[in-house]
A protein has these predicted regions:
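C-terminal, low-complexity/hydrophilic appendages and adjacent surface loops
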Residues: 37, 117-200, 206-207, 235-238
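Short, solvent-exposed loop/turn and secondary-structure capping segments
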Residues: 4, 29-34, 56-57, 79, ...
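Beta-strand elements within well-structured catalytic alpha/beta cores of enzymes
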Residues: 1-3, 7, 17-22, 43-46, ...
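Polar, surface-exposed loop/tail segments
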Residues: 14-16, 61-129, 203-213
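A generic secondary-structure signal for well-formed alpha-helical elements
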Residues: 4-7, 11, 16, 49-52, ...
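Histidine-centered active-site microenvironments of extracellular/periplasmic hydrolases
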Residues: 6-69, 90
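Long, internal low-complexity/basic segments
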Residues: 41, 167-182, 190, 198-259
Length: 259
């Protein structure tokens, strides 16, 4: 609020785009650091300044169901400034010239990931298309409730684990402390909390294979480096991870297929 007030006092508010978004939680289990929707899906509001409304194909108060990722912010700001985003830049503009409200509403795919969080390492990748979400747990032998000092300072985590150890949880509640399946598939409309895994449902076999392929293609396209151990990353990729990924693209692809 202070920044917006200052922009108004300086006479610059109607020349300023304001992007207002939430964090990924932190005190509730399955929020910050997790690849569930409770950890990935955050609110976003954009204030369009009067002097630049001609650049945006939205009316005041409009809402959209189109998917936006944080990597889209860079290309969006460049596009609003009249600068064509470089083709190798991650993300896609969601406002500005060439981006209609109808086009944005059609965007129904998004990639998600989780890796290291403090002393906890857990490689997870996700691909969502519309209401369907695919999760690949590369280290499914780890439970979601694996010890993490930051998290277990929060009462909800600590109390939940105490109830698990006392055998006072139902099967759904126990999932958080037990090993996860390698693959998970969720219908987010019917199951917004992602507890009913449909990956083993024969009726969903075709959809499972499709989303699995989409995720693998995405990981290869960005040269996902998490297949390498961290000590290798520190010695060989810390200076320029992008260059390291390009140089080792074929190996990344083979590791992805192997995993």
């Amino acid at each position: 609020g202070r920044i917006v007030k200052q922009r108004a006092e300086d006479g610059l508010l109607e020349d300023t785009f304001v992007f207002y978004f939430g964090d990924h939680g932190g005190v509730m289990p399955r929020s910050k650091g997790y690849a569930y929707e409770s950890g990935l899906h955050v609110p976003l509001a954009v204030r369009i300044p009067k002097n630049f409304r001609h650049l945006v194909d939205h009316k005041r108060g409009d809402r959209t169901d189109g998917f936006v990722s944080f990597i889209d912010f860079g290309p969006t700001v460049l596009n609003l400034a009249g600068i064509k985003p470089h083709k190798e830049l991650d993300g896609v503009a969601f406002l500005g010239q060439g981006v209609s409200a109808a086009d944005l509403a059609k965007r129904d795919e998004v990639f998600g990931h989780a890796d290291r969080f403090d002393e906890k390492f857990d490689m997870v990748r996700t691909f969502r298309k519309g209401k369907w979400k695919y999760i690949r747990n590369y280290q499914g032998y780890y439970a979601d409730g694996l010890q993490n000092n930051y998290r277990y300072r929060q009462l909800a985590y600590d109390n939940w684990r105490d109830l698990y150890r006392a055998d006072r949880l139902n099967p759904v509640q126990r999932q958080f402390f037990e090993r996860r399946p390698v693959e998970q598939l969720f219908d987010l409309e019917a199951d917004p909390h992602e507890v009913n895994n449909l990956a083993g449902d024969p009726d969903q076999a075709k959809r499972l294979a499709d989303l699995r392929g989409r995720l693998r293609s995405k990981m290869k396209s960005i040269n996902d480096l998490s297949f390498y151990p961290e000590n290798r990353m520190v010695t060989d990729a810390l200076g320029d991870g992008v260059a390291f990924g390009r140089k080792n693209a074929q190996q990344v692809s083979r590791l992805s297929d192997l995993a």
